[in-house]
Amino acid sequence: MKIGIIGVGLMGGSFALDFRSIYKNSKIYGFDVDIKNFQYSIDNKIVDELLSETNCKDLDFLIVSVPVHIIPDVVKKYLDFVGSNTLVIDLGSTKNSICNSLNDHPKRDQFLASHPIAGTENSGPKSAIKGLYTNSINIICCLLYTSPSPRDNTT
């Protein structure tokens, strides 16, 4: 399985650690605007290599774990790059503005809005915790707008 993670801090980094523990032979691509955070995530095997427009086409999932106010722009940009079977999932808290901004996107059906009820007061990849999402609730929003085909990958 191949996934991409945009934002390799607490939430994205923790997702990567848990994902790797379940899918041991997975490939995890990552990106962070802070080069030090990205390098830390590479050096500590949180992610395997840099996420690019090219390797986005072959992902099973793309996790967007960035500040809420930029999620709509990031999701729109990457929906244009991902393949037809890639599911893009955000980990932000608020959903109304995110979902409304994507209503007219041609690949809206490949986006799943989620709000994991998990976290700590810390940030950055050094605070990534294996098991952060264990026994946590994840609120899924606007599911009717997401295609069943990419959703099938989530089981």
Question: What is the predicted role of each segment?
Answer:
Residues 1-50:
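NAD(P)+-binding Rossmann beta1-loop-alpha1 motif at the extreme N-terminus of oxidoreductases
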Residues 29-31, 51, 89, 112, ...:
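Hydrophobic/aromatic beta-strand patches that form the interior of the parallel beta-sheet core
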Residues 55-79, 87:
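Rossmann-like NAD(P)-binding element
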Residues 66, 92, 142:
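Glycine-rich, N-terminal phosphate-binding loop of Rossmann-like dinucleotide-binding domains
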Residues 74-126:
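Rossmann-like NAD(P)(H) cofactor-binding subdomain of soluble oxidoreductases
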Residues 126-147:
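Short beta-strand and adjoining strand-loop segment in the mid-core
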Residues 145-155:
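Single conserved hydrophobic/aromatic residue that forms the stacking wall/gate
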